[in-house]
Each structure stands twice: as structure tokens, then as C-alpha cells.
Design a protein with these regions (language model features):
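Periplasmic N-terminal accessory/gating domains of Gram-negative outer-membrane beta-barrel systems
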Residues: 116-169, 177-195, 200-208, 225
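Flexible loop and strand-edge segments within Gram-negative outer membrane beta-barrel domains
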Residues: 291, 311-359, 374-405, 542
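Surface-exposed extracellular loop regions of Gram-negative outer-membrane beta-barrel proteins
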Residues: 322, 376, 442, 516-561, ...
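Gram-negative outer-membrane beta-barrel transporters
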Residues: 581-583, 605-691
Length: 802
């Protein structure tokens, strides 16, 4: 099969171009480069075999000189600022161009990461996501981001993202510009982003542009693919615990297209025979257990082009988790009753948006969006006691649970204005009404002769409303040939009840090009967050609540300075060293009794406000070719907290991982086979353990009588004493992952891929939780023992593209 292929290598630096090209035309390119201070971008093969021409360069008009050099050669040129991009069309077997095209794409992506103004920005495209980290053979965006320097992952296999000492709930997740509140499936095993439909991800850790706001620590901006306007494309994947399907194409050719992507797990199907066997074995013990779990994601979009400059797009998304666990004690001759206990957990996101993009002219364009987004979480417990076909539980059936819901309606408009070639101004505004609901309930009903009679319902809940308004202006310009600036200002206001909070957030990022291949960048940014995730545990569970800032709980705020050196090295290598310092205020921490459900009534009184600080250095090295991809990163960081009601002074954060190393290597051995290996290690998380127990009868007295000490309503004779919070570091975390892909072409010309992945190759049982107890029956010393839960996990998947 022959096709016309245009080979363009974008942003390839002149100092790394091959010296084995045709000397005649190469010398003319060098002369133009020196004369006009431009960089030529091209594939070395396109100038081979071209005869030299005797010409005289004018030195006054670059366009005339370019036309003189390349006229009659078949080479097309395009002037892009201070780059000249060369391309050439020719017919050749497509298979022989795969590596060249891949090299051009990889080089472009590598230089995109280093040729920008912002610090702390990582750009990922679809190919990077699909070729990287895959647990259960399912590529996952958040799992890839967890491997980035400056990011802590929290508990193993969870979707935690603790960026630069953040809290985990201070990351702004955007799906096509719409915020998501919950991005975890299966308790964090997967994220809510289906990689089949993802086009690109921009991940900001510092140097935030003024157009982003509402969270403290990071921005994860996920953009999905629009459907093809001329042809139908799709894919089908089946894995160990889930399946995926994607299809897109024209509705009206050249005018309207669609893209639909589905993902669903079949754990609920797989567990049916498993628990059938378990129940057959346990029947003699009079017990029956049932477990069902399912998750799904549905992404859809319809795009209509009124013209090339006027595009309207409708985006829809729904992602849900459903879990039920029940245990049933069967009747016996001695006890004819049947006890049933159950747990139900549901959570998920839904969103809809209408996105209008209008390009007025070459200098002005606009994007306006109306959207709705909702998060809903529910956990419920139930218990029944059946006797002689009549259900009785002290005359009642009981179900109690917890509900958390957040709904946003938003309208935002952004403008792009380019007053000059190297000058871009962005500005816009948005308004977001927020609706929060938190509820704890208990329902009782009586069964008489098999009929359910509602008895009573008890509930306590809270509803909050808040309106967030923001506006910004952002100016990006190239001040000189060696200095670029991105400066902006964001204003936000939040009304909750009779209280209005105002926030002015300056942003600035500056780049100095000290060498054609070396940049020095620095940035300063301030961020505000008006909503809080209320949790009484250190895990992202459906029981957690979202609450707004109130008159007594102020918004959170962060200030961050970052600076670094970024080098583009020969042989497709890059190296960056970046440091940061960040402070946070308005953080909240739970100080109430230990419980799974966070408080709802007067929740502000059971949380205390404090501050945080974090600093560190990140080193990242990359080597990327058409067949090899090596990525190494190291992070040295400190993360501390200061809550006066918890401790008088600074102490280490729970996820204060001092050192972190990530190494990954991908190799394309042939066109049909590639493999990857990854290894990660970081210092262990921290936990609070009492240093010793003190007998209070010999310590506290009032006059001649000992004081009676009570903890949670029980009189005790001893209490724990701590040196400081998070005083113990659990063992370090490390593991290795392997994976490989087999590619083949089916008889119909479609690509199929077999993937085999192994998570935790050497079965390191990394600490997941710890048990605290005495170091001996009569000892006052305390010891803690960590336990691991996640062993080696092999998995596979099959993908067919059409």
C-alpha cells in the first residue's frame, strides 16, 4: 500500500542535525541560519541527492532567499517565527516510514516539554498514555501522573495525587474544561478517565496560568478526542476485569461527527461462580455470602462545524461504581431464624457541557461553555432477622447510611487575542453556583405477615449553597530573542450565606534562554480553594463529604515559588532540575472521635484550621528515540503541617516522602513487539504511634485524690503519650512492573494488540496498614507492625483497532 506521506520534524534544534547531509544545500542552509538567526527544522533525508545551485543570498529578505534556495528542489518551506520548517512529499511504502514518523513525533513531544514558559508542566499525548503504566493491563492517567517527580501516591493502588505536599483533595481535575470531584473507581484502582478517548493531558504542578483556579496544588486538564469528520474509526479491548469499546466518525460527512467510548468491569459476573463455590463449602457452617461489584464509564461527544472557524461541541460523561456485600446466616434446627447483614456503596460523576469555539479572525478567537457537573456518593448498612418467613429485627428492619452530593452549574467564556506575532493575550470570566448536600439517615420498617410497614425515619443533614465568580487576564509575550514572560492576574469571589470571600491571585512565569538548548525559568503563583473535603479517615472514600467555606471556616490559599534549569541535550536527550517552595493556609484537619462517617451537624467545630509548608528539588532525565524511551526522575522533598490544636509547632505530614525515584524504559524491538519495565521507590509514609503509656493514677491528682480520666465514656487508668504527630515512618515502598505488547495486522488490515502486564514482579508486600500494640503485656512501650495486602498481579488484554 502506497500513500503520500509528509515528513515534518518540528522544533528539531539546529545543533543536533546530522552532518552527513548534502554539503552543497547544507552549506546554504547554514548560511541562511547565520544570516537571519533562525533554526531550520527538517528530516535529514529530504535534502539528500539534491544538486547544488549557484545563487547569491541577498541578506535582506529571508522569504526571497528561501525561495531562491529551495525552488525546483521539491522541498516546501514554512516560516514559523524564528523556525523554518522544511517538508517534502513523496511516495514510498508506508511501512518504511513508520520509524521516521515516530521519531518526528517523539522529537516534537520532547521539545514541546522544554520549549515553554511555565515551570512544573508535563504534557502527555494519547500515545504516551497507552504505552506506559498499565495496572490490570488497563492504561490509566492518574497512575501515570503518580510517577511524576514531586507527586506522592498515598496508599498503594489508590488514585491519590498528593502534589507538592498537597492534601489530595486540592487537585483540579478538568474533563474537556468541566471540573470533576471524584476520579476514582474500585477504591482507587482505576481513575475515571478512559484512555481510549483521551487526546492529551496537561499536568501543572507550579507556574499556574491565570486561566486556572479553584484548587491549591495541581491542575489535571484532560482533553478528549472529537470524532473523525470523514472516516469511521474504533477499537475494542477486553482485559482481565474490564472491557472497553470506542467508535467515532461522521454523522454528516465533513460537517458533523461523533465519538462514543464505553468501559465496564465484569467483576460482578466473575464473582458469581467464585462465591457459588465458597457458599457450597460454607453451607455446612450455615453461612452464605454474596459480593457484587461493577463500574462503568460512558463518554460521548457530538461536534458540528458551521465553518472551519465556528465549531459547536456537546460533551457527555457518566461514571459510576456499584458495590454490594451481604452475609446470610441460614436457619438450622436449633435456630430457625435467618440473619442478613449487608453493605451497599454507590458513587460516581455525571457531566454535560456545550462548548462553542469561534475564531473571529487571525488575531481574535473565543470559547464559551455552559456545563453541569454532579458528584454523588452513598454508603448504606442494612440488617434483618427473619423468622418463619416473617422478617423481624426487634420488630424492625434497619438501614442506615451516609449521602454526599455536590452539583455545579457553570458558565465561562475565554478570549484569545494576538496583537502581534509573539504576543498572546488571554482573558475571560466564569460564574459557578455550587450546591452541597450531606445527610446521614436511618430507616426502620416492620414486617408483618410478609408485608413491610414503614415504622420511622431519622435523619440529620445539611444543605449549603455557594456562588463562585472569577475573572482573569493573562499576557504571554516574547520580550527579546532570549526572554519570554507569562504574566497574569486572577480575581475570585465566593458568596456563602451572608459572607463573601475575595481573592486576588497574581501569576508570573519568566524564561531566560541562556543558550539555544538551555533555558532558565522561574515562576510565582497564588491559588485559592473555596470548598473542603471533609473526612475522618486518610482515604478517599464515598463517606467523605464536600463542604463549602463558611463564616467560621475560611478558604484555603497557597503561594508557590519555583525555578529550574531545562536543557535539550544531543541525541534526543533532555535534563531538567527544578526547585520549589510552597506555603498553604486554611487547611483543615479532623480532631473529633475516630469514626468512619465524618460529622454533619456543626461539622466546623470538629475540624481545626492550620497551615502547611513544603519544599524540594526535582530532577528529570529523558532519552527518547524511535525505538527507545528512558525516563528517570528523582525527588528530594519535605512536607510539614502546623495545627495548633494538634501540636504546638511544625511536624511532618503523613505523606512526607523524603526521597522518591522512578525509572521506566520502553523498547520497540520490532514493528510487532515492544516491552517496558518500570521501577519505583520512595520513603515510607508516616503514622502516629504513642511512645509509651502512662498510668494516670500515679500522675494526675487533685488534692489528695487521683483524677478520674475518661476516654470516649470509659474510665481508664492510663493514657498514651506522643512525642509529636506522625512520629513513625513505616518501611519504604518499592516495586517493579513489566509489560509487553504484540502487534499484528489482521486479514482485514486492522491492527490487533496483545498485552501482558505484571504488577509488582518480585511480590514486594509493601505496607498498606499497621497494627499498634504493647511491646509485651506489662510493658509501657508501644510497637507498630506494618502489613501488606497487594502481591504480584499478572494481567492481560486484547485490543482490536478498526
Amino acid at each position: 500500500m502506497k500513500r503520500t506521506v509528509s515528513i515534518i520534524s518540528i522544533f528539531l534544534l539546529c545543533f543536533s542535525l546530522s552532518a552527513q547531509d548534502s554539503l552543497s544545500i547544507k552549506s546554504q542552509i547554514d548560511a541562511l541560519q547565520k544570516q537571519y538567526d533562525v533554526n531550520f527544522v527538517y528530516d535529514p533525508g529530504i535534502i539528500q541527492g539534491i544538486d547544488s545551485k549557484e545563487i547569491t543570498l541577498s541578506g535582506k529578505n529571508i522569504k526571497k532567499d528561501l525561495s531562491a534556495v529551495f525552488s525546483g528542489t521539491g522541498i516546501d518551506w514554512e516560516l514559523r517565527k524564528n523556525f523554518v520548517v522544511l517538508s517534502k512529499e513523496y511516495e514510498q511504502e508506508l511501512s518504511s516510514n513508520i520509524d521516521t514518523l515516530e521519531a518526528a513525533r517523539i522529537t516534537t513531544d520532547k521539545l514541546r516539554r522544554t520549549n515553554r514558559t511555565q515551570t512544573g508542566l508535563n504534557h502527555l499525548d494519547a500515545s504516551k498514555l497507552l504505552s506506559g503504566y498499565a495496572v490490570m493491563s488497563t492504561p490509566d492517567i492518574v497512575k501515570v501522573l503518580q510517577t511524576m517527580p514531586g507527586v506522592a501516591s498515598g496508599s498503594e493502588l489508590m488514585s491519590g495525587l498528593y502534589v507538592h505536599g498537597g492534601t489530595g483533595s486540592d487537585n483540579l481535575y478538568l474533563l474537556d474544561g468541566v471540573p470533576l470531584y471524584q476520579v476514582s473507581h474500585l477504591a482507587g484502582l482505576f481513575s475515571s478517565f478512559n484512555s481510549d478517548i483521551v487526546e492529551s493531558v496537561d499536568f501543572y504542578k507550579s507556574g499556574f496560568p491565570a486561566r486556572y483556579g479553584g484548587r491549591l496544588s495541581s491542575v489535571v486538564d484532560v482533553n478528549t478526542k472529537a470524532g473523525d469528520f470523514n472516516e469511521y474509526h474504533g477499537s475494542f479491548s477486553i482485559g482481565l476485569i474490564d472491557g472497553r469499546f470506542n467508535i467515532g466518525g461522521p454523522i454528516v460527512k465533513g460537517k458533523t461527527s461523533f465519538n462514543l467510548s464505553l468501559r465496564r468491569s465484569w467483576l460482578d459476573v466473575v464473582t458469581v461462580p467464585t462465591f457459588a463455590i465458597i457458599n457450597a463449602v460454607n453451607r455446612k457452617y450455615g453461612e452464605k455470602t454474596w459480593f457484587g461489584y461493577s463500574l462503568w464509564d460512558v463518554n460521548g461527544s457530538i461536534t458540528h462545524k458551521f465553518s472551519e472557524d465556528n465549531v459547536l461541541r456537546l460533551n457527555l460523561y457518566n461514571g459510576q461504581d456499584r458495590m454490594k456485600l451481604s452475609n446470610k446466616s441460614l436457619p438450622t434446627d436449633d435456630d430457625p431464624s435467618t440473619d442478613i447483614s449487608s453493605v451497599k456503596v454507590n458513587w460516581g460523576n455525571s457531566l454535560a457541557s456545550l462548548d462553542w469555539n469561534w475564531r473571529f479572525d487571525d488575531k481574535m478567537s473565543m470559547r464559551s461553555m455552559l456545563y453541569y457537573t454532579r458528584y454523588n456518593g452513598k454508603m448504606a448498612y442494612g440488617y434483618e432477622d427473619r423468622s418463619n418467613d416473617t422478617k423481624v429485627f426487634s420488630g424492625d428492619k434497619e438501614e442506615s447510611g451516609n449521602i454526599s452530593r455536590v452539583q455545579d452549574i457553570g458558565l465561562k467564556t475565554d478570549f484569545w487575542w494576538m496583537p502581534a506575532e509573539k504576543h498572546l493575550v488571554r482573558f475571560g470570566a466564569s460564574v459557578q453556583p455550587h450546591f452541597y448536600r450531606a445527610e446521614r439517615y436511618a430507616e426502620y420498617s416492620r414486617y408483618v405477615d410478609g408485608n413491610e410497614i414503614p415504622d420511622s425515619t431519622a435523619s440529620n443533614g445539611a444543605k449549603y449553597y455557594g456562588t463562585e465568580f472569577s475573572s482573569y487576564i493573562e499576557d504571554e509575550m516574547k520580550l527579546t530573542g532570549w526572554m519570554s514572560l507569562n504574566a497574569g492576574l486572577r480575581y475570585s469571589a465566593y458568596q456563602t450565606g451572608r459572607k463573601v470571600y475575595h481573592s486576588l491571585e497574581p501569576r508570573a512565569a519568566l524564561t531566560f534562554s541562556v543558550h539555544p538548548s538551555v533555558d532558565i525559568r522561574a515562576s510565582y503563583s497564588e491559588m485559592s480553594q473555596f470548598n473542603h473535603q471533609v473526612s475522618s479517615v486518610y482515604m478517599d472514600l464515598p463517606t467523605n463529604l464536600w463542604m463549602p467555606s463558611t463564616e467560621s471556616v475560611r478558604p484555603m490559599r497557597s503561594r508557590q515559588v519555583a525555578a529550574g534549569v531545562y536543557a535539550r541535550l544531543p541525541e534526543n536527550m533532555s535534563l531538567s532540575v527544578e526547585g520549589y517552595w510552597k506555603t498553604m493556609s486554611g487547611l483543615i484537619e479532623y480532631v473529633g472521635k475516630s469514626t468512619l462517617f465524618p460529622p454533619i451537624d456543626s461539622w466546623e467545630s470538629q475540624f481545626t484550621s492550620g497551615k502547611g509548608r513544603t519544599w524540594g528539588v526535582e530532577i528529570q532525565y529523558q532519552w527518547v528515540t524511535a525505538v527507545d524511551n528512558l525516563d528517570f526522575s528523582y525527588t528530594l522533598s519535605w512536607s510539614q503541617r502546623n495545627f495548633e490544636k494538634i501540636w504546638n509547632g511544625w511536624y511532618a505530614d503523613r505523606f512526607d516522602n523524603r526521597h522518591k525515584i522512578n525509572v521506566s524504559y520502553t523498547r520497540k524491538f520490532t514493528k510487532r513487539f515492544d516491552a517496558y519495565i518500570a521501577w519505583c521507590w520512595h520513603s515510607g509514609n508516616r503514622m502516629t504511634v504513642a511512645d509509651y503509656m502512662v498510668d494516670t493514677r500515679h500522675v494526675f491528682t487533685m488534692g489528695d485524690k487521683p483524677v478520674k480520666v475518661e476516654m470516649e465514656g470509659f474510665a481508664v487508668s492510663e493514657i498514651p503519650f506522643y512525642t509529636r504527630p506522625n512520629n513513625v515512618k513505616i518501611p519504604d515502598y518499592h516495586r517493579m512492573d513489566l509489560g509487553c505488547n504484540w502487534h499484528r495486522v489482521t486479514k482485514r488490515g486492522n491492527e490487533s494488540i496483545w498485552n501482558l502486564s505484571i504488577y509488582n514482579v518480585y511480590c514486594r508486600m509493601n505496607p498498606f496498614y499497621a497494627v499498634v500494640g504493647r511491646n509485651g503485656m506489662y510493658s509501657s512501650e508501644i510497637k507498630a507492625r506494618a502489613y501488606g495486602l497487594v502481591p504480584i498481579i499478572p494481567s492481560f488484554s486484547y485490543t482490536l483497532k478498526f
